[in-house]
Amino acid sequence: MIQQQTYLNVADNSGARKLMCLRVLGTGNCTYGGIGDQIIAVVKDALPNMPIKKSDVVRAVIVRTKQPLRRASGMSIRFDDNAAVIINAEGNPRGTRVFGPVARELRDKNFTKIVSLAPEVL
């Protein structure tokens, strides 16, 4: 569960390393975000000489959470870290690679480009 002020790792090669969540996008007063939800975040740590700089406000989609995700089959899945992929206004990733596993639920939320770039889909 991701809320305001939560720090996330960046799971792509866009140049950012750490994000801090400013707002969870959704319907109404959406307090918490889970896998597949879009967030507005600020870049807290970035690599030098890359297009995304520190203190940039970006849009991202959550791909991993430490909070267990309950599936309809009864299985629950949990990751080791909270991570997000930076996206543009159309919902496509800004980077060209995605690092680490991502959840299958991203395909249901129409983030097929992120799923196809990921090395492992759980």
Curated annotation (Swiss-Prot):
Pfam families according to UniProt: Ribosomal_L14
Domain of life: Bacteria
GO biological process: translation
SUPFAM superfamilies linked: Ribosomal protein L14
Keyword rRNA-binding: yes
Record carries keyword RNA-binding: yes
Keyword line: Ribonucleoprotein, Ribosomal protein, RNA-binding, rRNA-binding
GO cellular component: cytosolic large ribosomal subunit
GO MF annotations, alphabetized: large ribosomal subunit rRNA binding; structural constituent of ribosome
UniProt cross-references to InterPro entries, sorted A to Z: Ribosomal_uL14, Ribosomal_uL14_bac-type, Ribosomal_uL14_CS, Ribosomal_uL14_sf
PANTHER family registered for this protein in UniProt: 50S/60S RIBOSOMAL PROTEIN L14/L23, LARGE RIBOSOMAL SUBUNIT PROTEIN UL14M
Similarity comment: family membership: Belongs to the universal ribosomal protein uL14 family.
Quaternary data: Part of the 50S ribosomal subunit. Forms a cluster with proteins L3 and L19. In the 70S ribosome, L14 and L19 interact and together make contacts with the 16S rRNA in bridges B5 and B8. Can interact with ribosomal silencing factor RsfS, which may inhibit ribosomal subunit association.
Function recorded in the entry: Binds to 23S rRNA. Forms part of two intersubunit bridges in the 70S ribosome.
Protein name: Large ribosomal subunit protein uL14
Record organism: Synechocystis sp. (strain ATCC 27184 / PCC 6803 / Kazusa)
Lineage: Bacteria, Bacillati, Cyanobacteriota, Cyanophyceae, Synechococcales
Encoding gene, per UniProt annotation: rplN
